[in-house]
């Protein structure tokens, strides 16, 4: 029996984003309302931090995405609002996406590796 049970939700029960293996960041939206004591992952992580003595406010998934974009240059052009816009229309954005008007990067390392340590043919 577990000492601690974290009452997480499935993807269909929460809001947020996910990144797939082609670096595409897409929105997920709550499809069903649930009853009971389950919580979104971000709520669980924040509660663990608070209980360990690292006080943090409870943020929405949009606020977390905005913070990620503010500290991670390759995500600087990604936000919930942009992912929800007609411009993106459910396709998502592929990082690096370095500015609010950047279209995303479908192919990385064209011709060479970003650090110049190898060669792509």
List the predicted regions and their residue ranges.
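Non-catalytic alpha/beta scaffold blocks inside enzyme catalytic domains
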Residues: 1-77
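Long, low-complexity segments enriched in small/aliphatic residues
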Residues: 65-121
